[in-house]
């Protein structure tokens, strides 16, 4: 399962709409970098955040998730409380080819500050804004900057085409827009 280079990512983004909007070269000056890299794409976090709060002493249950556990914020700088997390989304909308699986890793700039980004793999033929889970593992509040780089996506091309894609299964997160909470 080879990792795909910048030339392939650029071609797929510009001719097939795999990443929209697509930033051709890495933007770095005065911001946390984003855009095309050698073997990946550094995505930006949008200015929409759902910040976890436990004012009602709730129990987190993925089968019966209570949306009131979050406070919605539209802001250029999100403050994530100590030992808490926030949900966000990418600025970019992704359309994954049928023979590709995409994995996501957090950027080292944030990891070195105790912020961890978690995203499940983007499956073949999935499309949408990527919902990002950002964990603040520190005992202090932490900042996340909207419209700057947060994570890097790596594109792995399969040796063949999968028999059943995410679209074929009519996956529950297909074509998601905005920050999407857990669904059953």
From Swiss-Prot:
**This protein's pathway:** Pyrimidine metabolism; dUMP biosynthesis; dUMP from dCTP (dUTP route): step 1/2
Provide the E.C. number(s) assigned to this enzyme.
3.5.4.13
Q: Keywords, A to Z?
A: Hydrolase, Nucleotide metabolism, Nucleotide-binding
**Lineage, broadest ranks:** Bacteria, Pseudomonadati, Pseudomonadota, Alphaproteobacteria, Rhodospirillales
Give me the disulphide-bonded residues: none
Keyword Nucleotide-binding in record: yes
Any single GO molecular-function term of the entry would be: dCTP deaminase activity
What protein name is recorded for this chain?
dCTP deaminase
Q: Does the keyword Repressor apply?
A: no
Q: How does it assemble?
A: Homotrimer.
């Amino acid at each position: 399962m080879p990792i795909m280079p910048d030339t392939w990512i650029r071609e797929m983004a510009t001719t097939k709409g795999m990443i929209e909007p697509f930033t051709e070269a890495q933007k770095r000056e005065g911001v946390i970098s984003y855009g095309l890299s050698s073997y990946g794409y550094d995505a930006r976090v949008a200015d929409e955040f759902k910040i976890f709060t436990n004012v009602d002493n709730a129990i987190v249950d993925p089968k019966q998730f209570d949306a009131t556990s979050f406070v919605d914020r539209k802001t250029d700088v999100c403050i994530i409380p100590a030992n808490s997390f926030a949900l966000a989304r990418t600025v970019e909308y992704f359309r994954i080819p049928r023979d590709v699986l995409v994995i996501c890793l957090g950027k080292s700039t944030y990891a070195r500050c105790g912020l961890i980004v978690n995203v499940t793999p983007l499956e073949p033929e999935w499309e949408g804004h990527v919902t990002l889970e950002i964990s603040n593992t520190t005992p202090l509040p932490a900042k996340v900057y909207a419209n700057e780089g947060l994570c890097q996506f790596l594109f792995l091309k399969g040796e063949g085409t999968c028999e059943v894609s995410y679209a074929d299964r009519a996956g529950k997160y297909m074509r998601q827009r905005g920050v999407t909470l857990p669904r059953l």
